[in-house]
Amino acid sequence: MVVLKWTNKYSGETGYVASVSTKVQCFVNTFNMDDAKRYSEKAVKGILTKLDNYHETDNNIFEMIEA
């Protein structure tokens, strides 16, 4: 299982994805890796596509981290 770490391209702030809201089309962040949602590596591709479609990748870089 992996978690998604995000880094803001402009501020350098970092954290983890706690959830992805399809209703609001955004992600909810957490600064504690223990609170981050665990994903299978297979599921991450779809999550990253959603985040790109929600324009979250305009300001953030997402990377997989082993949980």
Q: Language-model segments: what does each one mean?
A:
Residues 1-32:
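Short aromatic-glycine-(Arg/Gly/Cys) micro-motifs in beta-strand/loop hairpins
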